[in-house]
Swiss-Prot record:
Belongs to the peptidase M17 family. GO terms for cellular component: cytoplasm. Presumably involved in the processing and regular turnover of intracellular proteins. Catalyzes the removal of unsubstituted N-terminal amino acids from various peptides. Mn(2+) 1 binds at residues 275, 352, 354. The active site is at 282, 356. Its cofactor is Mn(2+). It catalyses: Release of an N-terminal amino acid, Xaa-|-Yaa-, in which Xaa is preferably Leu, but may be other amino acids including Pro although not Arg or Lys, and Yaa may be Pro. Amino acid amides and methyl esters are also readily hydrolyzed, but rates on arylamides are exceedingly low; Release of an N-terminal amino acid, preferentially leucine, but not glutamic or aspartic acids. It comes from Erwinia tasmaniensis (strain DSM 17950 / CFBP 7177 / CIP 109463 / NCPPB 4357 / Et1/99). It holds the Pfam family Peptidase_M17_N. The gene is pepA. It is an enzyme of class 3 (hydrolase). InterPro entries: Leucine_aapep/pepB, Macro_dom-like, Peptidase_M17_C, Peptidase_M17_leu_NH2_pept, Peptidase_M17_N. This is Probable cytosol aminopeptidase. Binds 2 manganese ions per subunit.
Amino acid sequence: MEFSVKSGSPEKQRSACIVVGVFEPRRLSPIAEQLDKISDGYISALLRRGELEGKVGQTLLLHHVPNILSERILLIGCGKERELDERQYKQVIQKTINTLNDTGSMEAVCFLTELHVKGRNTYWKVRQAVETSKEALYSFDQLKSNKVEPRRPLRKLVFNVPTRRELTSGERAIQHGLAVAAGVKAAKDLGNMPPNICNAAYLASQARQLADAYSKNITTRVIGEQQMKELGMNAYLAVGQGSQNESLMSVIEYKGNPDAEARPIVLVGKGVTFDTGGISLKPGEAMDEMKYDMCGAASVYGVMRMVAELNLPLNVVGVLAGCENMPGGRAYRPGDVLTTMSGQTVEVLNTDAEGRLVLCDALTYVERFDPEVVIDVATLTGACVIALGHHISGLLSNHNPLAHELIGASEQAGDRAWRLPMADEYQDQLESNFADMANIGGRPGGAITAACFLARFTRKYNWAHLDVAGTAWRSGKAKGATGRPVALLSQFLLNRAGLNGDD
């Protein structure tokens, strides 16, 4: 679908449809008031008859309104004017896209980007409209033999901005929004792919294809089990021992900073392409969803695509730590003691706490890049789901400024994270009688002790950990990957590049 911005009066629009807002209780938005005046009170008369109350998501499609050049006007409820926030704004945009498609509109001019959203500027409103539109149109049917094409006639959407001087900001918002949306889609597609297709080798092939597509800035190298063994990545290797699929770590390097020697931002994604729990076998119910245990790696891949698409003036390294945790005669066991790449030893108490074993070696590996910061992304703990539910990701960090940056980016992007504490007292729960540490710390504070484990491998750089176990996918009827936290990390990198949309 094509997006563009313009600045014009609603009465001058010759379009298949104009989209304007109505507030509760039956209050016209400023643009709707202009149309009402031109139509000699036609719209307000309909509202007085109770045709539309203005609740969030309510719609009323008007045909051939008197004195209006456009064929139709779509009125959409926006709730109470002073309470229109980011979440409601996105709900309104999503409803708009679905309604336009349902009603057969091929193109439309949307004036919702002129609504006042608390604390948000035109750039934010246009960009969120683009990202939300793409989200509303997403489907995953690659593996269906009988593809039913949904009715999506909408081909062009024009966002109106209040003044001509905001056109540049709006155009930039579309560019950024499309790149972020493409990154989200890439992450969702990877996450939704079944584990018999999407194994570590598949992740590696996608990483190589990304380098082929953006060869000017991106190089990819893939580290196999033999090289991991030579590097001493024994914890990572142990997790994949029970699987017939080789563990592979894909390292994607993007160089966009004019200073080629500038220290990179490093993103590390947990890529366990299927997690049975290993010898500590998971319950059978909903085990199919353990294909989503690679959503951390999928999100890093999506972010790297966004970075390359926008040609950001940064150096960024993305690591996809791919493997599969299966039971078998060669699988690692509870009671094993592993020597990590860092030289520290770990007693395995539960083979289903495997993500931290993969990450600890990957986090040691990335020391060689002399990183400015390192951010790992992982569907790491069920404890984080219990703590924060399915709406907000967990954030833990050894560096306050980095944590504050990420929280700020999460608020900007509408991809929220919440910082959890990581006090030294929690480290005591990881004590082992037989090794430097255990790989679990018991049930209390499980998301925190998992991060405390990782913190022992990140002492040489500023680091943050995003636990997306509750936010990376949805269960139930709407089952599927969400693409989070691509939007959060994209915003973080846009901010670092000085492209945060502030006018």
